[in-house]
Amino acid sequence: MVEMLPTVVALVLAVSVVAKDNTTCDGPCGLRFRQNPQAGIRIVGGQTSSPGAWPWMVSLQIFTSHNSRRYHACGGSLLNSHWVLTAAHCFDNKKKVYDWRLVFGAHEIEYGRNKPVKEPQQERYVQKIVIHEKYNAVTEGNDIALLKVTPPVTCGDFVGPGCLPHFKSGPPRIPHTCYVTGWGYIKDNAPRPSPVLMEARVDLIDLDLCNSTQWYNGRVTSTNVCAGYPEGKIDTCQGDSGGPLMCRDSVDSPFVIVGITSWGVGCARAKRPGVYTATWDYLDWIASKIGPTALHLIQPATPHPPTTQQPVISFHPPSIHPPWYFQHLSPRPPHLRPPRPLLHQPSSVHTSSAPVIPLLSLLTPVQPVSFTLAAYHTRHHTTLSFARRLQHLIEALKMRTYPIKYPSRYSGPVNYQHRFSTFEPLSNKPSEPLLHS
């Protein structure tokens, strides 16, 4: 027993050193410490996550000074011990740092809580709110923000940094199946956000399809990512704003935050998928705020060189996952035609958590933008029949004469539907599980 004592002491010291190093949040990013064993089985339905499954997930909570209560409003992603990534629209109405509290390492949250959090949760103040200089609250352009945290967050078993794309990765590859998480509402007009962190799988959707006339009719820009399902099924919702859209290469690779939950029309409606701010387009901006070294620490290894195989244009996950989730895309071959939009299938499904910051009203129809993934800026031309061109002209005139009006997600004058959740007096209605199909 005495002979084993030096070995035991050495192990204790080693564990102590590892734990100390881990508290700086400079370790590996995008790693799930505790995974739900069913996560690989259920492909379309949302489910409750396991504690510690998404250690970079942050709850942004509005703080009311008169009674010290906190109300979940948005989600965010921990980048390191000092910075959180989120959506700019979360601060349209609450721009002061003292209006906010940040909760890390949470699995369950209490809406309207006025007591200190319990371990392993950590509550922090916001030292600085950095909103993109060109953020447009009307068009939803540049919907990205950073929060400086004080005091620094301590990383551990339930708190860890998320990854951002590598500069050389390029835009997210389509098709690809990814994850969304949040404490958002489980359906439109739900009484309050979900008390438990939920997770769900969603498909990345081609921007041509997402911007077609029966979908978002050109509202989506080149710095957005669409994710969800054509028929609805599952989606983020109020209370999920600012939270991450995450993809990974394989079960052994880290998750990479490819999008920030921004806006959508309703929740889980057919042909109205969630719209996310693409993080890859803002890596330079993020580096200018948190520092290039800090950004490098949360970027995975440089991706493998792309294959010579032509990209597949599809809207359903392939039977075999691609070798990596990012790749440089070659120009679209002229013989490929973009897929036609699917027939309308009304469907109602729940949504994801986050206070409401609606900004999505189509006051004046905009021409659909060209496909926006990196090298896909030039769309090929196809010859249309006279009848087809006439039909397009009639549709365009109808849109100008009768612009589409969508119900707002926010109780203010703006018509866009943010995924931000406004807090209201607590309801006696029991909460329901989030994100089920």
Curated annotation (Swiss-Prot):
Q: Which residues are glycosylated?
A: N22, N211
Q: Which organism is it from?
A: Rattus norvegicus (Rat)
Please give the subunit comment from the record. Answer: Heavy chain (catalytic) and a light chain linked by two disulfide bonds. Forms a heterodimer with SERPINA5.
- Which GO BP terms apply? acrosome matrix dispersal; acrosome reaction; activation of adenylate cyclase activity; binding of sperm to zona pellucida; penetration of zona pellucida; protein catabolic process; proteolysis; response to steroid hormone
Protein name as catalogued: Acrosin
Disulfide linkages recorded for this protein, renumbered to the chain, are C25-C155, C29-C163, C74-C90, C178-C247, C210-C226, C237-C267
Molecular function via GO? amidase activity; D-mannose binding; fucose binding; peptidase activity; serine-type endopeptidase activity; serine-type peptidase activity
InterPro entries (UniProt xref): Pept_S1A_acrosin, Peptidase_S1_PA, Peptidase_S1_PA_chymotrypsin, Peptidase_S1A, Trypsin_dom, TRYPSIN_HIS, TRYPSIN_SER
